[in-house]
C-alpha cells in the first residue's frame, strides 16, 4: 500500500528535544520525531515525540506521544495541548503522516 499526503511536515535530520514536566513536577526528555502542519485542515500544528529513555515492547514497538500546538503571535511555538481522543479526523491525519514519515526513515 502506498501512502500519499499533502501535509507539510519537518524532515529535520538533526534531532530536536523538548522537556515535558508532569503534574508531579517530574521532567522527562523527549526527541521531536516530526512536526505536522495541520493549520489548513484543523487550525493547529502537531508534534510527535519519543521518550529518549524507552524500552521496546515484545513486538519491537515504542510508545510515542502526539500533541497539538498553535504558534504564538511572535512566531514561537505555543503550549502543547492534548489531542482529544474522539478527534478521529485529527488522529487519522497524524497516523497517516507519521506512518509515511516512518516508511521514509526505513528507506
Swiss-Prot record:
It comes from Lactococcus lactis subsp. lactis (strain IL1403) (Streptococcus lactis). This is UPF0473 protein LL0144. NCBIfam families: PRK13678.1-2. It comes from the Bacteria. Belongs to the UPF0473 family. InterPro entries: UPF0473. Pfam families: DUF1292 (PF06949). Signal peptide: none annotated. Transmembrane segments: none annotated.
Amino acid at each position: 500500500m502506498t501512502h500519499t499526503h499533502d501535509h507539510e511536515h519537518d524532515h529535520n535530520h538533526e534531532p530536536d528535544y523538548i522537556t515535558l514536566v508532569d503534574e508531579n513536577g517530574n521532567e522527562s526528555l523527549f526527541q521531536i520525531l516530526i512536526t505536522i502542519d495541520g493549520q489548513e485542515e484543523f487550525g493547529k500544528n502537531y508534534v510527535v515525540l519519543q521518550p529518549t529513555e524507552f524500552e521496546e515492547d515484545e513486538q519491537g514497538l515504542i510508545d510515542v506521544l502526539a500533541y497539538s500546538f498553535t504558534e504564538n503571535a511572535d512566531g514561537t511555538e505555543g503550549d502543547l495541548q492534548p489531542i482529544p481522543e474522539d478527534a478521529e479526523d485529527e488522529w487519522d491525519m497524524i497516523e497517516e503522516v507519521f506512518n509515511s514519515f516512518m516508511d521514509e526513515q526505513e528507506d
